Amino acid sequence: LPFWASCTSKYKIEGTSSVNSLDGKMLYLKSLRDGEWVKLDSAEVVHGLFSMKGKIDSVQMVTLYMDEESIMPIVLESGKITVTISNTDLKAVGTSLNNALYEFISKRNQLEESIGELEQKETRMVLDGGDLDEIHGQLVVEGDSLMKAMNQYVKTFISDNYENVLGP
C-alpha cells in the first residue's frame, strides 16, 4: 500500500422507523469514553428515515440515543448498516458483527420468552385437570433445560467473540 493510504474505514447507517413519535427528532450515536457518553454522529428522523455516515479508526460498540434515552446498541464498523426501529423490534444488520449481535439478541429473547411461557403452561395444565405435583415436576425439568440452553448459548457467544467488541 502507498504510504499515504488511510487507516480509517467508512460506515454508513441507513435507518427506518415506524415509530411516529421519532419523526422530527434527532438521533445520536454515542460512545462511552472514560465514563462519559460522547456524541459521534447525529441525524434527524424525517418521514421515518434517517442516515449517518463517517469515518472510524477502529470497530467500536456505540449506542443509538434519542436525547438522553438509549434506544439500541450498534457495532460501528466499516460498511453499510441497516437499522430498523419499530414498536416491536430493534435491529441493526448488514455488517458481520451487527448481524451476529442481533442474531444473538433475537435467539436470547426467544429463550427468555419460552421460559416466561412456562407459568402460563402450568396454569393451562392445571385447568385441564392435571396433577399439580406432576405438572410442577415436568415444568421444573423444562425450565432447567431452557435455562441451561440459554446459559450455554450466552457462554458460547462470548467465547466465539472473545477477540472482538462483542466479547466480554
What annotation goes with each model-predicted range?
Residues Y162-P168:
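Amphipathic alpha-helical repeat scaffolds of TPR domains
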Residues L1-A5:
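Sec-dependent bacterial lipoprotein signal peptides
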Residues C7-K155:
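A non-transmembrane, solvent-exposed segment enriched in polar/low-complexity residues
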Residues T156-D160:
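Solenoid-like repeat scaffolds
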